[in-house]
Amino acid sequence: MTDIFNITHSEEVFSSALKLMPGGVSSPVRAFKSVGGQPIVFDRVKGPFAWDVDGNRYIDYIGSWGPAICGHAHPEVITALQEAIEKGTSFGAPCVQENKLAEMVIDAVPSVEMVRFVNSGTEACMAVLRLMRAFTGRDKVIKFDGCYHGHADMFLVKAGSGVATLGLPDSPGVPRTTTANTLTAPYNDLEAVKKLFSENPDAISGVILEPIVGNAGFITPEPGFLEGLRELTTENGSLLVFDEVMTGFRISYGGAQEKFGVTPDLTTLGKVIGGGLPVGAYGGRKEIMSMVAPSGPVYQAGTLSGNPLAMTAGIKTLELLKQEGTYEKMGLATSRLIEGIMQSAENNGIAINGGSVSAMFGFFLCEGPVRNFEEAKTNNSELFGKLHREMIKRGVYLAPSPFEAGFTSLAHSEEEIDRTIEAFDQSFSVIKN
């Protein structure tokens, strides 16, 4: 590995970007605010690798923030897109590809009997919130501290992702009246949820959560937590919603609900199902989804929803994922990676705890365990920033925030895992003092 990179061109491009876009980026975390150093400007990606505009190559553990589960620019996905684009980029009308991808999602995800495609995970969560309220006739919703469900006003309360990265409790411009119906509880705390139901009888439309928190680092559900939420929502006539934008088709073909054996009423999806193109979806029981326009009165629409390119990329990606041994392969690679990272930290006297589920992983530089967002905030963010900068020098691209999960793909081989662990060994050795 090269010990240091020349990133002069990245510096020049980003300097220009600062004059053109707020913070120089189209999404806040990309600005490296929580890790320091120069944001890297990418030129191209392929397989497990990304190349910046200076020609430096990185082993990529962001994967476009989750969609690139088959590896970047998979040849079969590219070929399918090349064929599709010859027929046009968007129809603004029904297309065959919508039917095919819908069938695949319904076949895979236990809770989904009908599905509606949108253009982002945020859109999916906005729409599912409206649907929850309409179906139950109730206004309040419970979310969990550190869980991120997009940047809609109702969800910007104790949120994760970029909100956590920047240390914001909420966002200016969100009226208190908008968030008055958003109730929050610590993740993995069933008693707190029970208390909210007790204090708000017949008023809570549902509970929405990331079944594995990936936007406050990487936090897994304690045994019985998801099952307890299922029981509580059923008992109180409320809906359970899994935000599987991140976990859907990543930790298993049927997502977290298949992995943990807990079936919600509604599910939101994104990332993987678009194969790298903008996409989102929400689905669930027929009796609930039938309320969505034009079948029912709950309005939701989108100019590019269900466009043939995103549908095509999604179809090919799911076909690749359905092949035998896919998740076992990714799971073994990811387990070896996180075990190597933790061993390397321990060898250098650095406190760490972490874990992985299939092709998703994360770690905190603190004493563990981490079960919720408050505990996640004990992470040594300053040390993580130093680690991130050292890893960049050694050609490994981690999420530029301690509050984001990492992702592997089918393209990450033993060689990439070994080189990554070597880079961690070197980086931990540098930052420990």
From Swiss-Prot:
GO terms under biological process: chlorophyll biosynthetic process; protoporphyrinogen IX biosynthetic process
Pfam families xref list: Aminotran_3 (PF00202)
PROSITE patterns linked: AA_TRANSFER_CLASS_3
Cofactor field: pyridoxal 5'-phosphate
InterPro entries: 4pyrrol_synth_GluAld_NH2Trfase (IPR004639), Aminotrans_3 (IPR005814), Aminotrans_3_PPA_site (IPR049704), PyrdxlP-dep_Trfase (IPR015424), PyrdxlP-dep_Trfase_major (IPR015421), PyrdxlP-dep_Trfase_small (IPR015422)
Subcellular location: Cytoplasm
Residues modified as N6-(pyridoxal phosphate)lysine: K271
Family: Belongs to the class-III pyridoxal-phosphate-dependent aminotransferase family. HemL subfamily.
Name under which the protein is recorded: Glutamate-1-semialdehyde 2,1-aminomutase
Species assigned in the record: Prochlorococcus marinus (strain MIT 9515)
Gene name linked to the record: hemL
